Amino acid sequence: MKRKLIIKNFPVIVLTVLLILSIGQTVTASGLFGPLQTVSKQDGGLNTAIGYWYHEDTYQNDTNHTVRQNEIYSQAAYGAKNIWEIYARIGISDLKIFDIFNSTDASTTTNKNDFEENWKFFGTLGAKAFYPINKVFGVGAFIQGTSYFSNFTDDIVGTISGTPFTTDLKVKNLWDVNFGAGLQVTIPHGIKLYAGPYIYYSEAEVSLASNIPGLEYSAGDVSIKNKTMLGGFTGLDIPLIKGFHLNIEGQFSDRFSAGAAVSYTY
């Protein structure tokens, strides 16, 4: 009896272990990955979604900086046979980088410490594949990449030994790519729970318009990238009414990213 009980609940046990491992990871990635299995109809069809994503990460060159973003996006996807899906997103995002304007030179003062810019457009492409082991348990994998269409720019003013200055910092060519795999369990009412690990790489170029003593960055492009390439994710997909689904997802690290999306299956 105990053996049958363990076998019956094996998918839930494995999923729980993955959730624990995911929480222990040290990085987050940009955007929802979504359920491992497409929500499109069995015979093939379109689904669309609108979503929001709150993202935090640590980027580094010689110094670590916390990065925060709020993303709003619209998605169109096509999937079939409950096993594959391709999708595209278009959205807008802000960008905040903490303590990037701190001066290490006592003769230089600045009017603020943090970089902030609002609402630049980005695009995302992704694909996923799913293998149903049985009606409850399945495994899947995905790849997803995001690129921003324009630069983020913020102005800064201050003084150097009492002499005023004005300059700006640009964050250019911000992009990321993610690849992951996971397990999915379907529980009563068609609710899908999923979790797994992923690898993640993100990069951007940072440049200051002019050289300012004491500021970390200078004229000329300097590359920054995410601090750690490994992460974990978990989420659930909840059927609502008349083709609508609610997707809630978190990506865990020393910082936390999370978001939600509402999709409609045609």
For each feature predicted by the language model, list its residue ranges:
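Outer-membrane beta-barrel "beta-signal"
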Residues: 124, 238-239, 254-266
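Transmembrane beta-strands of outer-membrane beta-barrel pores
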Residues: 52-58, 90-96, 129-131, 145-151, ...
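Transmembrane beta-strands of outer-membrane beta-barrel proteins
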Residues: 46-50, 86-88, 123, 139-143, ...
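Outer-membrane beta-barrel transmembrane domain signature
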Residues: 78, 131, 135-137, 144-244, ...
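Solvent-exposed loop/turn segments connecting transmembrane beta-strands
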Residues: 62-67, 94, 135, 226-228, ...
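Short glycine/proline- and aromatic-enriched beta-strand/turn motifs that initiate or cap beta-hairpins
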Residues: 25-82, 86
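Extracellular loop and loop/strand-boundary signature of outer-membrane beta-barrel proteins
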Residues: 58-63, 106-116, 163-170, 218-222, ...
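Residues that define the transmembrane beta-barrel architecture of outer-membrane proteins
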Residues: 44-46, 66-72, 101, 117-123, ...
